[in-house]
Amino acid sequence: MQGDTVVVQAIIHEGRVARIATLSQQAHPSITPIYFAAVRRQLWLGTSDWTLAVRQVRADPRVSVLIAPELRPHDPRIVRVSGHASARTDTQAQMLYVLHVALKYSLNPGQLRNTLAHAHLIRLRRRYHQQSAAKGSMCIIAVVPERFELLP
């Protein structure tokens, strides 16, 4: 993924939740927090095909994504990525996204310790994912960046 500066790339790398702004048919913005991964010079955000974010991306692909350096909570800088998005439901994209997300969120020492400390919540997490899957299929919002901005 190409960013304007090393700082922009670092914030994108350490960000945990992206906030995607999509537009309704009346051009009203909606903001949705979603887990994400940088994949093939794009931002991929994982969700379900029934969500408002996906419906709005399908109607109007213009999006902005905000990412903050969450590992440094006192750092006020935010990266805004503007671009066009598409909704992907193909198996290849899903598998690649799951791999990137597992490496980013689950398969690091800090997260492994956290998962073990909260093992009693695994059933609850599994039920949440089953309920979401019952409503629709997994979907990736793939954002092709056109502009990066470092906001103070």
Model-derived segments and spans:
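Short beta-strand segments
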Residues: 15-49, 55-57, 64-69, 77-80
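A generic structural signal for nonpolar/aromatic side chains embedded in well-ordered alpha-helices
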Residues: 11-12, 57, 101, 143
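Secondary-structure transition/turn motif
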Residues: 48-51, 145-147
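Charged, gly/pro-rich active-site loop segments
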Residues: 74-152
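Extreme N-terminal tail/first-helix region
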Residues: 1-17
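Amphipathic alpha-helical interface surfaces
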Residues: 8, 53, 93-97
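Short, intrinsically disordered, mixed-charge
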Residues: 58-63, 103, 107
